Amino acid sequence: VENRRQFFRLEYPAKSGPRFLSGGVSYQVLDISEQGIKLGAHSTRGLKVGGKFAGSLTFTDGETFLVYGIVKRITDETVSIQLTKPIPCRIIMAEQRRIIQLFQKRA
């Protein structure tokens, strides 16, 4: 299977990702990249493919990043968002280091 993604995607182990809040609804963050975010879809009410999506992504260090994008895919379990404003690479790299350190301690 060919991986056609243009950007590194950081997958989060269960319950270790940042918090995403949109329209008063909190979503579990499954993975992030500079150009996209995948959320757990416990609620897709009001979402449609092609629709605009905005919210705040709050990382465990307290940094908050405002997210703007378009809903690209909705499944029974996930919502995929293509971002119109990229997440800075420095944030992705810091999160990658945090995940590595967190799980090295557990091993």
Predicted regions and their residues:
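Short acidic/polar mixed-charge low-complexity motifs
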Residues: 23-26, 61-65, 77
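Short conserved beta-strand and strand-loop elements enriched in small hydrophobics
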Residues: 15-20, 50-64
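N-terminal helix initiation/capping motif
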Residues: 1-34, 40-42, 96-107
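Short, conserved charged micro-motifs
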Residues: 46-50, 89-91
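C-terminal output/interaction extensions
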Residues: 79-107
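Generic beta-strand structural signal
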Residues: 32, 73-76
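Short, solvent-exposed secondary-structure boundary/capping segments
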Residues: 37-41, 75-86
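Short beta-strand-centered aromatic/proline hotspots
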Residues: 26-29, 66-72
